[in-house]
Amino acid sequence: MLDKRLLEVLVCPLTGGELYYDADSCELVSENAGLAFPVHDGIPVMLADEARKLEPDTK
C-alpha cells in the first residue's frame, strides 16, 4: 500500500507529469512516459532503469 499523501506530491521523474497507483501490480504509472514504477514495501522506486514499459493500448 502507498501512503495517499505521498502520491499527492510525487510526479514522474521523466515528464514531471501525474502518476496514479495501480494496487493490483503495486506500481506507480506514468501514462505520459509509458512507464510503471515499482513500489516495494510502500516505497516507490522512481528510477527509469527500474521501471516497466507499458504495453501500447490496442483498442
From Swiss-Prot:
It comes from the Bacteria. Gene3D superfamilies: 2.20.25.10. GO terms for cellular component: cytosol. Pfam families: Trm112p. SUPFAM superfamilies: Trm112p-like. InterPro entries: Trm112-like (IPR005651). Belongs to the UPF0434 family. HAMAP family: UPF0434. This is UPF0434 protein AM070. It comes from Anaplasma marginale (strain St. Maries).
